[in-house]
């Protein structure tokens, strides 16, 4: 991999290699684009097979956060940290203290958060060394469990997708097939049940599914059968890459809208959904409630303000469909274009020099 060629192709700003011999830290911090503001993205710890694989993951995930933050309407760029190591046995306090100091050394260009392989407790240790971290324990001023907020955003986005598909955003009487009933999906089911939707659920953990059956009157189907049920809306809320060559042929819905990340196995599957007449709410737009919620911590967390911002996911999804029609492209590409247009607009707006420019990390001091 020619790193500088790759960074130039996709407009990356910075790649920081961090090591600490005493703690065993080997980490990579990626900063993609900071046109909108400081880069925000989680910290992932994984048993990468090689350093190159870790670098590629940091670059891919960092760029993804640029699009997610921009599409969510946040004044934040995109970034990511990856740590090479086994989260089950390689963690220690010194490792996260050292990494916190590296992040502090970036002086606010990058803000970290919890991700795969890291925990709230790890973020608390990072917080000992830097203020450029979100998702810490509530005792340090965090927002707490983000699942209800994320779920509300998915619910609002689903209503927007229903409006596009059916001409009306009401979910009353609609049949919604929910794949996975974890923390976010459970809260989503609550909203859907309260509006009068009929729920069909599945989960590899039968206890999760049984809870939805008991509390919301949902119908249970085996995990392998969820793609075959007759429904109005299919809500993927578990693993990624579940929209693929095999499953698209089986889907019997008019809308795909759920909380799972990376729902399309390949980009071409977004085009295949369109060709089948299925309205697709792009995953990183509809599930942005979590990042919106955690970003609000940078202002001094206010639940009412965060929920109002999350409510706007409805309009973001409608705008995606508007761009798709305007440009004659599938909705997954329209989401990218919406993010890119916002970044380009702000790049032009911010071309004027300011000695002391306001941004999210100094907002309350200006």
UniProtKB/Swiss-Prot annotation:
Its keywords, alphabetically, are: Branched-chain amino acid catabolism, NAD, Oxidoreductase
Q: How does activity depend on temperature?
A: Thermostable. Retains full activity on incubation for 10 minutes at 65 degrees Celsius, but loses about 75% of the activity at 75 degrees Celsius.
Gene Ontology biological-process annotations: L-leucine catabolic process
Q: What does this protein do?
A: Catalyzes the reversible deamination of L-leucine to 4-methyl-2-oxopentanoate. Exhibits the highest activity with L-leucine as substrate, but can also use other L-amino acids such as L-isoleucine, L-valine and L-2-aminovaleric acid. All of the oxo analogs of the amino acid substrates serve as good substrates for the reverse reaction.
Name the Enzyme Commission number(s) assigned to this protein. 1.4.1.9
Assembly behavior: Homooctamer.
The entry summarizes how activity is regulated as: Inhibited by pyridoxal phosphate.
Q: What is this protein called?
A: Leucine dehydrogenase
Q: Which family does it belong to?
A: Belongs to the Glu/Leu/Phe/Val dehydrogenases family.
Gene responsible for this protein: ldh
Q: Which reaction does it catalyse?
A: L-leucine + NAD(+) + H2O = 4-methyl-2-oxopentanoate + NH4(+) + NADH + H(+)
CDD domains named in the record = NAD_bind_Leu_Phe_Val_DH (cd01075)
Task: Tell me the residue numbers annotated for binding NAD(+).
Answer: 180-186
Q: Which residues form a coiled coil?
A: none
User: Which PROSITE patterns would you find in this protein's record?
Assistant: GLFV_DEHYDROGENASE
What stretches pass through the bilayer? Answer: none
UniProt pathway: Amino-acid degradation; L-leucine degradation; 4-methyl-2-oxopentanoate from L-leucine (dehydrogenase route): step 1/1
Activity across pH? Optimum pH is 10.0-10.5 for the oxidative deamination of L-leucine, L-isoleucine and L-valine.
């Amino acid at each position: 991999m020619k790193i500088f060629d790759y960074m130039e192709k996709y407009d990356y700003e910075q790649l920081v290699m961090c090591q600490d011999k005493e703690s065993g830290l080997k980490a990579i911090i990626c900063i993609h684009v900071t046109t909108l503001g400081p880069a925000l993205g989680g910290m992932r710890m994984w048993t990468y097979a090689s350093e190159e694989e870790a670098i590629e993951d940091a670059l891919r995930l960092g760029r993804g956060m640029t699009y997610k933050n921009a599409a969510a309407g946040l004044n934040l760029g995109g970034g990511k940290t990856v740590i090479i190591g086994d989260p089950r046995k390689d963690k220690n306090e010194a490792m996260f203290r050292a990494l916190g100091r590296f992040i502090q050394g970036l002086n606010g260009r990058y803000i970290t958060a919890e991700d795969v392989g890291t925990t709230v407790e790890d973020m608390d240790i990072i917080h000992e060394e830097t203020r450029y971290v979100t998702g810490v324990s509530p005792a340090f001023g965090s927002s707490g469990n983000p699942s209800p907020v994320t779920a509300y955003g998915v619910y609002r986005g689903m209503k927007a997708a229903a409006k596009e598909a059916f001409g009306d955003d009401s979910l009353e009487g609609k049949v919604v097939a929910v794949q996975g009933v974890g923390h976010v999906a459970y809260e989503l089911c609550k909203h859907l049940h309260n509006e009068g939707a009929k729920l069909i659920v599945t989960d590899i953990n039968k206890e999760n599914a049984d809870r939805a059956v008991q509390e919301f009157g949902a119908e249970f189907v085996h995990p392998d059968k969820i793609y075959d049920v007759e429904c109005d809306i299919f809500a993927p809320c578990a693993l990624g890459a579940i929209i693929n060559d095999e499953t698209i042929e089986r889907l019997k819905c008019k809308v795909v809208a759920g909380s799972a990340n990376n729902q399309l196995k390949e980009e071409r599957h977004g085009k295949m959904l369109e060709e089948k007449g299925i309205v697709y709410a792009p995953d990183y737009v509809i599930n942005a409630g979590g990042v919106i919620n955690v970003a609000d911590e940078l202002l001094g967390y206010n639940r009412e303000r965060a929920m109002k911002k999350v409510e706007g996911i409805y309009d973001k999804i409608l705008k995606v469909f508007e761009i798709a029609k305007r440009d004659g492209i599938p909705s997954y590409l329209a989401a990218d274009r919406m993010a890119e247009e916002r970044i380009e607009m702000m790049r032009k707006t911010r071309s004027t020099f300011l000695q002391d420019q306001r941004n999210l990390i100094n907002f309350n001091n200006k």
